[in-house]
């Protein structure tokens, strides 16, 4: 009888233990609710943490790696008017470390960094060349003292140590994005470093990094393509940052930077409810979200993200011509202002661009390029959050004027409007889109980038 009692007790304990274990596993599995999209071939899971941070996950076990994008919903569109180029410059500074890495002694370094910030605020308001030179010399001297504590490239070394590839970042009009491709077993380490990076960023090596950004600016000055592109957008968006400022910024502003403005921008837009973490690869969704929550979950959200608003752009009632003088071969850009990237109109315009130029059977391809009527001609889309641009690019052949290239391109657009193209062209373009999409589904970079876009 006693033996039976012990067995019953053991069995009851085992049953309770199993029940407890099952409940724990179930609770873990259901701890993170997510949204999904019906018939999504990537089977995307969309999580939202309590602080508003979005997480997009897609499982693809093709390789034991994970493509990561951390996208901040802000870009050069939100640059202050007096410090254009700020979003791009901040992107560079995000690689300089935090309060936990990038410095051998954060406390000893801090007074020098504070002094550099204060002096740059004064420097940007000095106009006398001799005084500016003297003031900048003081900044440089203090920067050298701060550099004694700087550990260069520590972030890159940390990423290399965990086997990351493709460490990078980019800034556009509307988004700033940070990129890594990591081994599957390093997700937790990656999340820890990124959580620290986005919450505890420290601005180091400011004026030396400024020189690197200014060099980018100078390279852009020698590019006729960039100058024409900027001129086109200036005409299409005369009262909107898409047209009134560029991502690289004005040279005058780069010469008069503001660390204070950068910090204010960072604190305003680099908040969890303005960020999406986008991952695709060989990952366990529950464990991945748990790691991200562990390092990002206590990050305080912004009560209100005050994004600058701009009036609707004036109607374009007639063509506007602009001539840009350069040293490269002549080129033509024609642009049409269109709706925001999220609109259905953009999908239509992408198909129209393919009907005109797809490298083989578009109207531009068949009637102009293959018949050698122009040196080059193509169509495309520049998509942005608030507007998009449908554009045509062309290069004249020897002895041909840009006006002739424009006339030829516009005549093909008229054919398109009238439906004067092969009946099988539109179905073939749609099929090509589908084929391209499905062939790219093994590519984690493609998959994760869909969430950013």
Name each model feature, range by range.
Residues 30-31, 197, 201-205, 218-222, ...:
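An aromatic/glycine/proline-enriched structural segment found at the starts
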Residues 84-96:
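Active-site recognition of the HExxH zinc-binding catalytic motif
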Residues 12-24:
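Bacterial N-terminal signal peptides
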Residues 32-74:
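Mature N-terminal segment immediately following signal peptide/propeptide cleavage
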Residues 58, 63-76, 85-87, 103-196, ...:
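M16 family metallopeptidases and their MPP-like homologs
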Residues 25-29:
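Sec/Tat signal peptide C-region and signal peptidase I cleavage site
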Residues 2-15:
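Bacterial N-terminal signal peptides that target proteins for export
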């Amino acid at each position: 009888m006693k033996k039976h009692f012990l067995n019953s007790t053991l069995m009851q304990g085992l049953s309770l233990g199993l029940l407890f274990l099952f409940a724990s596993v179930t609770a873990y599995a259901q701890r993170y609710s997510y949204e999904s999209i019906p018939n999504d071939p990537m089977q995307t899971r969309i999580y939202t943490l309590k602080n508003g941070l979005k997480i997009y996950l897609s499982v693809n076990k093709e390789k034991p790696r994970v493509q990561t994008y951390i996208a901040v919903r802000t870009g050069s569109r939100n640059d202050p008017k007096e410090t254009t180029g700020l979003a791009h410059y901040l992107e560079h500074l995000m690689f300089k470390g935090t309060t936990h890495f990038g410095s051998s002694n954060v406390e000893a370094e801090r007074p020098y960094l504070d002094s550099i910030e204060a002096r740059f605020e004064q420097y940007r308001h000095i106009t006398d060349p001799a005084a500016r030179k003297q003031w900048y010399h003081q900044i440089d001297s203090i920067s050298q003292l701060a550099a004694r504590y700087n550990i260069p490239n520590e972030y890159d070394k940390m990423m290399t140590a965990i086997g990351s590839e493709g460490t990078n970042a980019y800034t556009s009009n509307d988004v700033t994005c940070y990129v890594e491709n990591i081994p599957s077993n390093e997700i937790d380490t990656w999340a820890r470093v990124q959580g620290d990076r986005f919450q505890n960023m420290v601005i180091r090596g400011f004026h030396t990094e400024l020189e690197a950004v200014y060099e980018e600016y100078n390279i852009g000055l020698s590019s006729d393509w960039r100058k024409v592109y900027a001129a086109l957008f200036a005409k299409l968006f005369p009262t909107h940052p898409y047209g009134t400022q560029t991502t690289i910024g004005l040279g005058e502003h780069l010469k008069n930077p503001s660390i204070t403005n950068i910090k204010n921008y960072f604190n305003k837009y680099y908040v969890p409810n303005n960020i999406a973490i986008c991952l695709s690869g060989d990952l366990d969704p529950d464990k991945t979200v748990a790691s991200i929550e562990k390092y990002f979950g206590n990050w305080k959200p912004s009560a209100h993200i005050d994004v600058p608003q701009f009036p609707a752009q004036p109607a374009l009632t007639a063509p506007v011509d602009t001539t840009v003088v350069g040293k490269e071969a002549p080129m033509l850009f024609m642009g049409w202002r269109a709706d925001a990237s999220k609109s259905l109109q953009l999908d239509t315009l992408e198909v129209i661009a393919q009907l005109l130029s797809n490298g083989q059977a578009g109207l531009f391809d068949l009637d102009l390029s293959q018949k050698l009527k122009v040196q080059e001609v193509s169509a495309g889309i520049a998509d942005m959050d608030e507007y998009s641009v449908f554009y045509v690019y062309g290069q004249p052949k020897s002895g041909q004027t840009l006006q002739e290239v424009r006339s030829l391109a516009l005549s093909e657009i008229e054919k398109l409007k009238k439906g004067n193209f092969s009946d099988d062209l539109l179905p073939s373009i749609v099929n090509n889109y589908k084929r391209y999409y499905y062939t790219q589904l093994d590519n984690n970079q493609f998959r994760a980038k869909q969430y950013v876009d």
